[in-house]
Amino acid sequence: MAFDYKKEYKEFYMPKNKPGIIEIPKMNYIAVRGKGNPNEENGEYKSSIGLLYGIAFTIKMSYKGTHKIEGFFEYVVPPLEGLWWQENTQGLDYARKEDMHFISMIRLPDFVTKEDFEWAVQEATKKKMQDFSKVEFFPYDEGLCVQCMHIGSYDDEPATVDLMHDYMKANGYELDITDTRYHHEIYLSDPRKCDVSRLKTVVRHPIRKTE
């Protein structure tokens, strides 16, 4: 049975649809940076997803080839995630999607080293005849956060964010979005296959204790 991060780490990937406080450990990701409206058909965001999955599946299927990764075990590729921000804006203004910056990412198993990642980029470039140079090995130490499961349209997320911020303040915390800590989304549903009213997205914000 392949290891499924969503099931083994439910506290990170399957929170309740009410806010909670959680400490997120440092994790390694494959990531692509970009900007622009995520709904744009030929935009940077949609392009980033193809690049990420090209590398993710090269690593996942590596055991069938000659490159052996030490400690490898079979696993389900973790869900797509995104860090989002807009310059000079605390949080996100959903009406200004064209101003959004993002780091699109997929979690790597702990056994994948930077050298394994670099091998995967070379392998995918060679096999798929595609440029994967935008993909990077991205360690992210997220730390203390408030998070909540959002069900429904991405455009309705502000209501969930308001609940999170009310809960955060009631428990003695304040928002800590900075140049290195971001609005974070984890996409548990495929919008191409799921009705918009049933989309599941983990929304996560960095916080700190109120002084």
Language model features with spans:
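A solvent-exposed interaction/effector surface
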Residues: M1-E211
